[in-house]
Amino acid sequence: MQYFVSVIDDVTGSATATGSATSTEMAAIDAFNDRLRADGHWVFAAGLGAPSTATVVDNRDGEAVFTDGPFVESKEYLAGFWVIEAPDLDVALELAAEGSKHCNRKVEVRPFL
């Protein structure tokens, strides 16, 4: 089963408002990613730009409206993610706990439907 592991950052945390991680954190993340690949859990991962780089698109009424900035103003934001393969939620949570330690941030785990 595949799981979405969201990396949650905040504007007052260890990363800057640009969403950058320290070189030590990046090295730890790279090592964790290598382990995910080696153990067959890797599907995909990526970091995301800072919330200030977001554009909200709303085309519900048939005419697209583009709004600069994040959908929701918040101290916490989605800084990156992993998509992992795990046989069950327990394994996914163990991997997420390791990911949280390596990136020095909170993470949220959700199964894909």
Predicted segments, located by residue:
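Conserved, structured core segments of small domains
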Residues: M1-L113
